[in-house]
Amino acid sequence: MRKKSSTPNRGFRVADQIQRDLTELIARELKDPRVGMVTIQAVEVTPDYAHAKVFFSVLVGDPKACEEALNQAAGFLRNGLFKRLMTHTVPTLHFHFDRTTERAADMNALIAKAVSSRAKDD
């Protein structure tokens, strides 16, 4: 039987704090040229805080190269989180490129195309 947490939203708060700290660490301390302007979109932490999926988007540059660089720097970033977080364990970081913004732009283009073709028909 699973034990209920004494603080119900702790996982969300930890994920939010990891997101804020990673954003700062990547911007200020990570010197890899493959990592350009990165935005951390979301962080999902497992219930045991052993792993965290970090979803990011890139404004400029190659997403695959950036994902590879971030996954290679995961140990360095995790070490930085150890110094900032006041938790017993800091999760292992797994970076994934978030395609949500690309899909949203594609959907907006399709909607605009449908609206313009409908306006021509009227």
UniProtKB/Swiss-Prot annotation:
GO terms for biological process: maturation of SSU-rRNA. Keywords: Cytoplasm, Ribosome biogenesis. It comes from the Bacteria. The keyword Magnesium does not apply. InterPro entries: KH_dom-like_a/b, RbfA, RbfA_dom_sf. GO terms for cellular component: cytosol. It is found in: Cytoplasm. GO terms for molecular function: ribosomal small subunit binding. Monomer. Binds 30S ribosomal subunits, but not 50S ribosomal subunits or 70S ribosomes. PANTHER family: RIBOSOME-BINDING FACTOR A, CHLOROPLASTIC-RELATED (PTHR33515:SF1). NCBIfam families: rbfA (TIGR00082). One of several proteins that assist in the late maturation steps of the functional core of the 30S ribosomal subunit. Associates with free 30S ribosomal subunits (but not with 30S subunits that are part of 70S ribosomes or polysomes). Required for efficient processing of 16S rRNA. May interact with the 5'-terminal helix region of 16S rRNA. Belongs to the RbfA family. This is Ribosome-binding factor A. It comes from Polaromonas sp. (strain JS666 / ATCC BAA-500). The gene is rbfA.
